[in-house]
Amino acid sequence: LKLTTSPVAVKLIPKGGEIPEGITRVDEAMRHCQLVDRVRRTGEEFYTLVEDQMCKGGAGAMGLGEMPPKVASGEFYFKGLKQFSTQGAARRTLEMVPKLPANSTEAIMYSPLEKASFTPDVVVVICTPRQVMLLTQAMMYKTGGRIESSFAGKQSLCSDGVVKVYKEGKIGVTVGCSGSRTYTKIADEEMIIGIPIELLADVASGLKEICPK
């Protein structure tokens, strides 16, 4: 596949669950998209609590705390970011964003896939469109079919890349959002693909067959 950065293993620890011994807490508050981008580049492994997540909209979507009222109502995207013609249009879009129940997640763990000390729920890969194509073809190698993608350019790495994949058990492809493309080093020519852990072995074996030798 010739990735230039690591696939990122992400695990959602349910409320009341225990954080494994030996994994350290992140050393500064950041957005989920920033955390994924940091891990893919630095090779660090850590966990985060709700207070470590700067973007409360992304954290709320992943069940870490609650969705901020101004985000859920559409006010933030309508009046703040001015990305919709009406607040109703913003609200409808946010209602459709994949999310977990509020306060259902205790912590979130991050690690480069190749050195993860835990079994992830989702593997997030940030790569070029061609590499997304190869990952898609690898997934299709065994049984065929199609990848169905759904996104709105909102809450991309959190909702589309993790929550949707976690809930549905299907691969998700997304294009990033204003936040993730502002606060990270994700390049204009990169996309995001989320792979549920249950399908990772099929993707890996398919890659061995279809990737150019």
Residue ranges: model-predicted function:
Residues K2-K213:
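Acidic, serine/proline-rich low-complexity intrinsically disordered regions
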